Amino acid sequence: EFRYSQYKVQYDMPKEAYESKWTQCIKLIDQGGENLEERLNSQFKNWYRQKYLNLEEYRRLTVLNQIAWKALSNQIQYSCRKIMNSDISSFKHINELKSLEHRAAKAAEAEMKKRAQKPKKKKSRRGWLCCGGGDIETVEPQQEEPVQTVQEQQVNEYGDILPTLRASITNSAINYYDTVKDGVYLDHETSDALYTDEDLLFDLEKQKYMDMLDTSQEESVEENEEEHTVDDEHVEEHTADDEHVEEPTVADDEHVEEPTVADEHVEEPTVAEEHVEEPTVAEEHVEEPASDVQQTSEAAPTIEIPDTLYYDILGVGVNADMNEITERYFKLAENYYPYQRSGSTVFHNFRKVNEAYQVLGDIDKKRWYNKYGYDGIKQVNFMNPSIFYLLSSLEKFKDFTGTPQIVTLLRFFFEKRLSMNDLENKSEHLLKFMEQYQKEREAHVSEYLLNILQPCIAGDSKWNVPIITKLEGLKGSRFDIPILESLRWIFKHVAKTHLKKSSKSAKKLQQRTQANKQELANINNNLMSTLKEYLGSSEQMNSITYNFENINSNVDNGNQSKNISDLSYTDQKEILEKIVSYIVDISLYDIENTALNAAEQLLSDNSVDEKTLKKRAQSLKKLSSIMERYAGGKRNDKKAKKYDTQDVVGYIMHGISTINKEMKNQNENVPEHVQHNAEANVEHDAEENVEHDAEENAEENVEENVEEVEENVEENVEENVGEKKMRREEKKKRVQEPIKIDEIQVYDIIKNEKKKKTEF
């Protein structure tokens, strides 16, 4: 306010005008603040309701909200300055008008004084003439100038109508103020009172952007001209009249140097005209790509992900928000759910829809899926589709009830494949988290009730139309009648406690709350013991959970603990009915407690008066009457609960048996494939080994043969050398001492010599 009060002091702004402008600014600031607060609260509540929120994602979203907050603050400041600067020049002229009027009043007062002094001067003049002794002449009194005032104008002695100073001021200042307000005054020096500093900065930025476009336009034109210079030279060589061809090229070169000149001067009926005009066409459309780029930059960016299978299954785009994904999931799940047993195809579709929502309905899993595709969800533990649909159905009423605590805990329990010991060790941390979450949950429900009941409080006759539409959409889901009956009963008696004769309803609420606490403690113990017996270990979890990475090891036949999938049909049905019944009862007690606290917050608001609180109580009672049409009473509640429990258990058992059969078939097919692959590998390896051994043996044999040949040659050479020496010695002996030799010996010696020669 101090900042904007400077306008009042600087431009001498009238008090009424300043108060009017400041009122508009206050209203604008309040509206912006309320809108911003509502959006931020809604955003943070959506984050808080998520099971997991990555720290980096939270930081990024927080920074984006801070940027949006600052942008809205700047916009409001800009709008307020616009309001304050809207007619500053008119106030200047009004002040000028006042000063001119003040001067005109002074001038008129001075003129009246002068006119009053004129008769005195004339009398003194006549007296002087009389005293001078001259002839006494009768001097008739001179009449005053015949000036008549005609409203704002004067008429002189000649009959001309002259504008007064006041009329001139009015024409120059008052009319200017009126024309400025109407927006028709065209004085270039003093008009445009709405042109502020922000407008000047905007125009400078716009001019800068236009200069950048002009620069890019010139560069594109020069590139086009360079591309077409070859064509121009080609045309110059082949035209009949070279002089006429050269003229357009010169004009075109001049046009490239000075692109501000229009292209009309280049157009001449020459042969090269077609080639010269092509750059001008590109020049005319230079601005179009810039506008397309600008439009694409302003549009929402499309996420590029490696795998879109789950998005295709749900029939949503990759940019779909959680509300759209949830709505699409329930629509598809409700179509497939009743027909699971009709064939494997329907169950397969129902299973895939649940898998898709288990991934895309969770922020962390969705982020990993968007980043890595199928590889990012290999370790995700998927629940039995019917169990997941049961928990999702209990969460479907979250606008009226919030997400039940048992649903949050069981999802955490199943998805993390925790044992009961792990759950007990983390119980303290979980309880603290659930207590804080419960407060936020009750505040959300109370806010939602206020939003849907506000039209009824305001007296709108059609306030119930959106509520009926909402309840019609919830109709048909699992355990819808028990949930609506609990909400109806709580809303009815809470509303009565704030109206006349409230003691009876207050007593009923107290008795029901105490009974719920006692039953809730027993049911919690029974559920924990049952889960610990049949789902206490990760091996026992295999009957209702699975993942893609260890899908072949999900069935553990060697486990000696009790497994639901190993029980008989009767025992399996009995155990599952107990578990489902316990889960539903705990959810209903939790829903009643949450609805009770939220309704009390709504009807005990200290920021409103008693009359408004009474209207809220009456509206809440009307809401309970509408819910009664869909609930059908306590007797119908028990029947519907029993029927839905048996129905859900039947589909859970069907899902367990179907998934286990698929896994067993896969496990049985593995050894056959392994044996077949082993035999094929053995044959292939044998062939490769034979070839490899043959090659190695051949090489080794060749090397060995070469070595043997070399050794034999050396030995033969040595033997031959030795034999020659022996022969020489024998010859010497023969010469010295003649020896007698038989013919047989001679024949043997010759034969041996020939044999040795042949071997060598």
From Swiss-Prot:
| Primary location recorded for the protein, binned into one broad class | membrane
Region of interest (Disordered), ranges: 214-300, 683-738
InterPro entries the record matches: DnaJ_domain (IPR001623), DnaJ_domain_CS (IPR018253), DnaJ_X (IPR026894), EMIR (IPR052423), J_dom_sf (IPR036869), PRESA_N (IPR019111), PRESA_N_sf (IPR044885)
- Glycosites: 425, 559, 563
Compositionally biased, Acidic residues: which spans? 216-230, 243-256, 693-720
Please provide one cellular component term from the Gene Ontology annotations of this protein.
plasma membrane
Which segments show compositional bias classed as Basic and acidic residues?
A: 231-242, 262-288, 683-692
Asked if the Swiss-Prot or TrEMBL record annotates the protein with the keyword Membrane, the reply is: yes
User: Which keywords label this protein?
Assistant: Cell membrane, Glycoprotein, Malaria, Membrane
User: SMART domains from the entry?
Assistant: DnaJ (SM00271)
- Domain J, by residue range, is 307-375
Q: Where in the cell is it found?
A: Cell membrane
Q: Where is the signal peptide?
A: none
**SUPFAM superfamilies found in the cross-reference section:** Chaperone J-domain (SSF46565)
- Membrane topology type: Peripheral membrane protein
Q: Does the keyword Membrane apply?
A: yes
- Pfam families in the record: DnaJ, DnaJ-X, PRESAN
Query: What does the UniProt function comment say about this protein?
Result: May disrupt the normal intermolecular interactions of the cytoplasmic domain of band 3 and thereby facilitate the invagination of the red cell membrane which is necessary for the formation of the parasitophorous vacuole.
> What name does the UniProt record give this protein?
Ring-infected erythrocyte surface antigen
